[in-house]
Amino acid sequence: MAMTDPIADMLTRIRNAGLAKHQKCDMPASNVKLAIVNVLKELGYIKNFKQISDDKQGILRIYLKFDNENKHIIHAIDRVSTPGCRVYVGKDEIPVVKNGLGNAILSTSKGVMHDAAAREAQLGGEVLCSVW
Protein backbone atom coordinates (compact mmCIF):
# COMPACT_ATOMS: atom_id res chain seq x y z
CA MET A 1 0.00 0.00 0.00
CA ALA A 2 1.30 3.44 -0.92
CA MET A 3 2.06 6.03 1.74
CA THR A 4 -0.42 8.89 1.47
CA ASP A 5 1.40 11.44 3.63
CA PRO A 6 5.20 11.07 3.72
CA ILE A 7 5.67 14.27 5.75
CA ALA A 8 3.39 12.99 8.53
CA ASP A 9 5.34 9.72 8.44
CA MET A 10 8.61 11.64 8.87
CA LEU A 11 7.24 13.64 11.81
CA THR A 12 5.96 10.45 13.45
CA ARG A 13 9.34 8.77 13.05
CA ILE A 14 11.05 11.75 14.71
CA ARG A 15 8.49 11.81 17.53
CA ASN A 16 8.72 8.05 18.18
CA ALA A 17 12.54 8.01 18.05
CA GLY A 18 12.67 10.85 20.57
CA LEU A 19 10.25 9.12 22.95
CA ALA A 20 12.28 5.90 22.67
CA LYS A 21 15.51 7.87 23.38
CA HIS A 22 17.14 6.86 20.10
CA GLN A 23 20.09 8.99 19.04
CA LYS A 24 19.17 8.87 15.34
CA CYS A 25 16.33 7.90 13.03
CA ASP A 26 16.30 6.95 9.36
CA MET A 27 13.63 7.55 6.75
CA PRO A 28 13.24 7.67 2.96
CA ALA A 29 14.55 10.98 1.61
CA SER A 30 12.80 13.60 -0.51
CA ASN A 31 13.41 17.26 -1.29
CA VAL A 32 10.58 18.50 0.95
CA LYS A 33 11.71 16.34 3.87
CA LEU A 34 15.26 17.62 3.41
CA ALA A 35 14.00 21.22 3.48
CA ILE A 36 11.93 20.60 6.65
CA VAL A 37 14.87 18.94 8.41
CA ASN A 38 17.11 21.84 7.38
CA VAL A 39 14.68 24.25 9.08
CA LEU A 40 14.54 22.02 12.19
CA LYS A 41 18.35 22.15 12.39
CA GLU A 42 18.37 25.92 11.88
CA LEU A 43 15.91 26.28 14.78
CA GLY A 44 18.00 23.99 17.02
CA TYR A 45 15.52 21.12 17.38
CA ILE A 46 17.92 18.49 15.99
CA LYS A 47 21.71 18.04 16.16
CA ASN A 48 22.43 17.22 12.56
CA PHE A 49 21.29 15.25 9.53
CA LYS A 50 22.83 13.62 6.51
CA GLN A 51 21.59 12.16 3.28
CA ILE A 52 22.77 8.63 2.49
CA SER A 53 22.55 7.51 -1.12
CA ASP A 54 21.31 4.04 -2.04
CA ASP A 55 19.89 2.40 -5.16
CA LYS A 56 16.49 4.06 -4.70
CA GLN A 57 15.60 7.54 -3.47
CA GLY A 58 18.13 7.71 -0.66
CA ILE A 59 17.93 7.69 3.12
CA LEU A 60 17.68 10.72 5.37
CA ARG A 61 19.39 10.15 8.74
CA ILE A 62 18.47 12.59 11.51
CA TYR A 63 20.52 12.89 14.70
CA LEU A 64 18.20 13.88 17.54
CA LYS A 65 18.96 16.36 20.30
CA PHE A 66 18.45 15.75 24.02
CA ASP A 67 18.86 18.03 27.04
CA ASN A 68 21.01 17.43 30.15
CA GLU A 69 18.32 15.22 31.73
CA ASN A 70 18.16 13.06 28.56
CA LYS A 71 14.75 14.47 27.58
CA HIS A 72 13.96 15.02 23.93
CA ILE A 73 14.20 18.69 22.90
CA ILE A 74 11.04 18.41 20.77
CA HIS A 75 8.02 18.34 23.11
CA ALA A 76 5.49 18.07 20.28
CA ILE A 77 5.70 17.97 16.50
CA ASP A 78 2.35 17.92 14.72
CA ARG A 79 1.20 17.95 11.11
CA VAL A 80 -1.10 20.89 10.36
CA SER A 81 -1.83 20.70 6.62
CA THR A 82 -2.72 17.21 5.41
CA PRO A 83 -3.33 15.89 1.88
CA GLY A 84 -7.07 15.79 2.64
CA CYS A 85 -7.26 19.22 4.26
CA ARG A 86 -4.67 21.73 3.12
CA VAL A 87 -4.14 24.76 5.35
CA TYR A 88 -2.98 27.93 3.59
CA VAL A 89 -2.37 31.23 5.35
CA GLY A 90 -1.66 34.74 4.18
CA LYS A 91 1.26 36.83 5.40
CA ASP A 92 -0.89 38.36 8.17
CA GLU A 93 -2.40 35.05 9.31
CA ILE A 94 0.76 33.04 10.10
CA PRO A 95 0.02 31.14 13.33
CA VAL A 96 1.86 31.75 16.59
CA VAL A 97 2.68 28.39 18.21
CA LYS A 98 2.48 28.23 22.03
CA ASN A 99 2.54 32.04 22.36
CA GLY A 100 5.87 32.25 20.55
CA LEU A 101 7.60 29.35 22.36
CA GLY A 102 7.17 27.08 19.34
CA ASN A 103 7.53 27.42 15.61
CA ALA A 104 5.41 26.75 12.55
CA ILE A 105 7.09 25.48 9.39
CA LEU A 106 5.64 26.82 6.14
CA SER A 107 6.06 26.02 2.48
CA THR A 108 6.18 29.36 0.67
CA SER A 109 6.92 30.50 -2.85
CA LYS A 110 10.53 31.14 -1.71
CA GLY A 111 10.96 27.66 -0.19
CA VAL A 112 10.35 26.00 3.17
CA MET A 113 10.93 28.32 6.14
CA HIS A 114 9.89 28.87 9.74
CA ASP A 115 7.20 31.32 10.78
CA ALA A 116 9.50 34.17 11.84
CA ALA A 117 11.36 34.10 8.52
CA ALA A 118 8.04 34.06 6.62
CA ARG A 119 6.78 37.06 8.61
CA GLU A 120 10.02 38.93 7.94
CA ALA A 121 9.84 38.17 4.21
CA GLN A 122 6.08 38.95 4.25
CA LEU A 123 5.17 35.61 2.68
CA GLY A 124 2.22 33.32 3.26
CA GLY A 125 1.93 29.71 2.26
CA GLU A 126 0.99 26.21 3.37
CA VAL A 127 1.48 25.47 7.08
CA LEU A 128 3.24 22.09 7.03
CA CYS A 129 3.72 21.46 10.75
CA SER A 130 4.14 23.01 14.18
CA VAL A 131 6.99 22.27 16.61
CA TRP A 132 7.60 23.18 20.23
From Swiss-Prot:
Gene Ontology CC terms: ribonucleoprotein complex; ribosome
UniProt source species: Syntrophotalea carbinolica (strain DSM 2380 / NBRC 103641 / GraBd1)
Family: Belongs to the universal ribosomal protein uS8 family.
Keywords linked to the UniProt accession: Ribonucleoprotein, Ribosomal protein, RNA-binding, rRNA-binding
NCBIfam families linked: PRK00136.1
One of the protein's GO biological processes: translation
Subunit details: Part of the 30S ribosomal subunit. Contacts proteins S5 and S12.
Protein's name according to its UniProt entry: Small ribosomal subunit protein uS8
Gene Ontology MF term list: rRNA binding; structural constituent of ribosome
Lineage: Bacteria, Pseudomonadati, Thermodesulfobacteriota, Desulfuromonadia, Desulfuromonadales
Function field: One of the primary rRNA binding proteins, it binds directly to 16S rRNA central domain where it helps coordinate assembly of the platform of the 30S subunit.
